[in-house]
Amino acid sequence: MDVMQRYVSPVNPAVFPHLATVLLVIGTFFTAWFFIFVVSRKSSKESTLIKELLISLCASIFLGFGIVFLLLTVGIYV
């Protein structure tokens, strides 16, 4: 404990804007796919709960990490 080592981020801060953009675009794609999937169903009696949950889970994960890196890009360190 005499000598403390400096913390180094696992992700280079120079790639935060690019990473945020890519993650937000992928999340927006999954969100659009989810809305199109729900609206274009022929009958509402179809049981597609698992597929809807998986698409929405992917969308929320990508959008969540995209927003975190967007906040880091603009200087809001969370």
From Swiss-Prot:
It is a multi-pass membrane protein. The keyword Endoplasmic reticulum applies. Keywords: Cytoplasm, Endoplasmic reticulum, Membrane, Nucleus, Transmembrane, Transmembrane helix. The chain crosses the membrane at residues 19-39, 54-74. It is found in: Nucleus outer membrane; Cytoplasm; Endoplasmic reticulum membrane. GO terms for cellular component: cytoplasm; endoplasmic reticulum membrane; nuclear outer membrane; oligosaccharyltransferase complex. GO terms for biological process: nuclear envelope organization; nuclear migration; response to endoplasmic reticulum stress. Residues 75-78 are perinuclear space. The keyword Cytoplasm applies. One of its GO terms (molecular function) is oligosaccharyltransferase complex binding. Disruption phenotype: Homozygous mutants display growth retardation and dy as larvae and show defects in ovarian follicle cells, which enwrap the germ cell clusters in ovarioles. Residues 1-18, 40-53 are cytoplasmic. Its main location: nucleus. Belongs to the OST5 family. Homodimer. Component of the oligosaccharyltransferase (OST) complex. Interacts with klar and Msp300, components of LINC complex. Subunit of the oligosaccharyl transferase (OST) complex that catalyzes the initial transfer of a defined glycan (Glc(3)Man(9)GlcNAc(2) in eukaryotes) from the lipid carrier dolichol-pyrophosphate to an asparagine residue within an Asn-X-Ser/Thr consensus motif in nascent polypeptide chains, the first step in protein N-glycosylation. N-glycosylation occurs cotranslationally and the complex associates with the Sec61 complex at the channel-forming translocon complex that mediates protein translocation across the endoplasmic reticulum (ER). All subunits are required for a maximal enzyme activity. This is Transmembrane protein 258.
